[in-house]
Amino acid sequence: MKNQASSTVALIDYGAGNLRSVANALLASGLARENLVVTANPDEVLQADRVVLPGVGAFASCMQALKAIPDMVPALEKAVLEKGRPFLGICVGMQLLADQGEEYGVHQGLGWIKGKVTPLRPNDPSCKVPHMGWNQIGLTTDSHPLLRAGEAYFLHSYAFVPEDESTLLATTEHGGLVTAAVGRDNIMGVQFHPEKSQSYGLEFLSRFLDWNP
């Protein structure tokens, strides 16, 4: 796998992500502009060395928007699950990795990481929903090459509840433990926003650009 100096990154444009902020953060993390492909074209996804799926909004509408692009979901499955391309899902892009989400009804996700996305229910009344702002990242494993302890920026009302504890890579505290990152093999999903997390987020993205799982 190529490193960040030469690898192409497909940033999926499906009308449900803060593309400009994520694109700018990837460029600030070391990605060459000519290697960033903001795309809704499945063929470009298949040609890319790495894939980033952002997401802002509700689980159902994001999944619907992704499915509305002809052949996009099959292209993602081929690139990530078959070819093993490094994949990063951000916020709702991470939640879509689940089997299902419970926002505005029960809706099917990509099913790449077993689990479901459920409403945040803090056990401390001082912890408001949505969970918004800076919070500590606690690691459940010290061996994953992408993750470090530190502070990151969150904005969400629902959280990923993984079925397999081995896929839970990091948590944060918001009236109880909340999933901050999930992953397996070449797949990484983060609930926090790297593009809003200043140096912590840029360093995380830089490691993703060099990641060769």
From Swiss-Prot:
Major location (coarse)? cytoplasm
Entry GO terms, CC = cytoplasm
Write out the catalytic residues in the record: 91 (nucleophile), 193, 195
Q: Give one GO molecular function term.
A: imidazoleglycerol-phosphate synthase activity
Where does the record place it? Cytoplasm
CDD domains given for it? GATase1_IGP_Synthase
Q: Domain Glutamine amidotransferase type-1, which positions?
A: 8-213
What EC number(s) has UniProt assigned to this enzyme? Answer: 4.3.2.10, 3.5.1.2
* Function comment: IGPS catalyzes the conversion of PRFAR and glutamine to IGP, AICAR and glutamate. The HisH subunit catalyzes the hydrolysis of glutamine to glutamate and ammonia as part of the synthesis of IGP and AICAR. The resulting ammonia molecule is channeled to the active site of HisF.
Name it. Answer: Imidazole glycerol phosphate synthase subunit HisH
Tell me the gene name. Answer: hisH
Q: Show the InterPro entries listed in the entry.
A: Class_I_gatase-like (IPR029062), GATASE (IPR017926), Imidazole-glycPsynth_HisH (IPR010139)
Q: What species is this protein from?
A: Zymomonas mobilis subsp. mobilis (strain ATCC 31821 / ZM4 / CP4)
Q: Write the record's keywords in alphabetical order, separated by commas.
A: Amino-acid biosynthesis, Cytoplasm, Glutamine amidotransferase, Histidine biosynthesis, Hydrolase, Lyase
Could you tell me the superkingdom of the organism this chain comes from?
Answer: Bacteria
Q: Which GO terms describe its biological process?
A: L-histidine biosynthetic process
Q: Does the keyword Amino-acid biosynthesis apply?
A: yes
